[in-house]
From Swiss-Prot:
Pathway: Cell wall biogenesis; peptidoglycan biosynthesis. Its main location: cytoplasm. It comes from Synechococcus sp. (strain CC9605). This is UDP-N-acetylenolpyruvoylglucosamine reductase. PANTHER family: UDP-N-ACETYLENOLPYRUVOYLGLUCOSAMINE REDUCTASE. Gene3D superfamilies: 3.30.465.10, UDP-N-acetylenolpyruvoylglucosamine reductase, C-terminal domain, Uridine Diphospho-n-acetylenolpyruvylglucosamine Reductase, domain 2. The gene is murB. HAMAP family: MurB (MF_00037). Its cofactor is FAD.
Length: 300
């Protein structure tokens, strides 16, 4: 018997309130664990009930269908906490810790490595799954290991960096049915905290002035077809400002789709397809998304 048997998760919760895009239908069930034990208990509960379990993390990089999601949706935004060692550069962080918080804490301790991540709207766990990156940096450079548990339940175990098959905006965690519980980073100690603060402040300023920071979005929608830039390709097609329903290709940065106030997930999905079709017709390149779709026929 688990600690979840005496109670039920929340039913019929609108997932739009749990995503950075502010779209999505209701979850059949929603749980917000605040500890590792509670997270594992909810996963075991879903397995015992024979229902699907999906991790929505803190709701960034996700597009959830307007019809919502069956089974248990696991929101990890309350699973926060970190411990750092300013001497060795080791940082142990729970999966729901916001990336900007992690970057600031590391900088204050004189630990170099995560200054690039200051404006990323996600969590440590999500960064590991997506190999999040910005401004020339990426998670794979600094991540040492992750602690995971199978979505179908079972014992947690550790995966080292070399086991994660990191590539551009990719890790094996995107294919495996594993939930990231915590992560360990190995940063460079001994740096001047004031200088690191200056760099993080400059990086954040750059993001807020070149991206639609004040509007609901998922961050970058498309992966760059290296060495080309997705945003540049989209802008060259004159697609900035293109709107379907309440969803709009940002006039600030073309690789962002923003919710202007009343968007639905279907509007965003249609805009994504419009961009993909237009770029493929012009350049023969099919842009792939960074965002993960839940409840749709296709997850990418």
């Amino acid at each position: 018997m688990t600690q979840c048997d005496a109670r039920l998760p929340q039913g019929g919760v609108k997932l739009a309130d749990y995503t950075t895009w502010r779209v999505g239908g209701a979850a059949e069930w929603l749980a917000e664990p605040a500890s590792l034990d509670e997270t594992q208990a909810w996963i075991e509960w879903a397995a015992h009930q024979g229902m699907p379990c999906r991790v929505i993390g803190a709701g960034s990089n996700l597009l959830i269908h307007d019809d919502g999601l069956p089974g248990l949706s696991l929101c990890l935004r309350k699973l926060q906490g970190l411990q750092l060692d300013a001497t060795t550069g080791t940082v142990e962080v729970l999966a729901g810790e916001p990336i900007p918080s992690l970057a600031r804490r590391a900088a204050r301790a004189g630990l170099h490595g995560l200054e690039w991540s200051i404006g990323i709207p996600g969590t440590a766990g999500g960064a590991a799954v997506m190999n999040a990156g910005a401004q020339g940096g990426c998670t794979a450079e600094w991540l040492e290991s992750v602690r995971v548990v199978p979505l179908e339940g079972g014992n947690c175990f550790e995966l080292q960096r070399h086991q994660l098959d990191f590539a551009y905006r990719h890790s094996r965690l995107q294919e495996d049915n594993l939930v990231v519980l915590s992560a360990r980073f190995r940063l460079q100690p001994g740096h001047d905290p004031d200088e690191l603060k200056r760099v993080t402040t400059a990086n954040l300023s750059h993001r807020t002035t070149t991206q639609p920071y004040q509007q609901p979005s998922c961050g970058s929608v498309f992966r760059n077809p290296e060495p080309l830039k997705a945003g540049r390709l989209i802008e060259e097609q004159g697609l900035k400002g293109t709107r379907i329903g309440g969803a709009e290709i940002s006039t600030v940065h073309a690789n962002f789709i923003v919710n202007t106030g009343d968007a639905q997930a279907k509007d965003i999905a249609q805009l994504i397809h419009l961009v993909q079709d237009r770029i493929e017709a012009k350049h023969g390149i099919r842009l792939h998304t960074e965002v993960k779709r839940l409840g749709f026929a296709s997850a990418a």
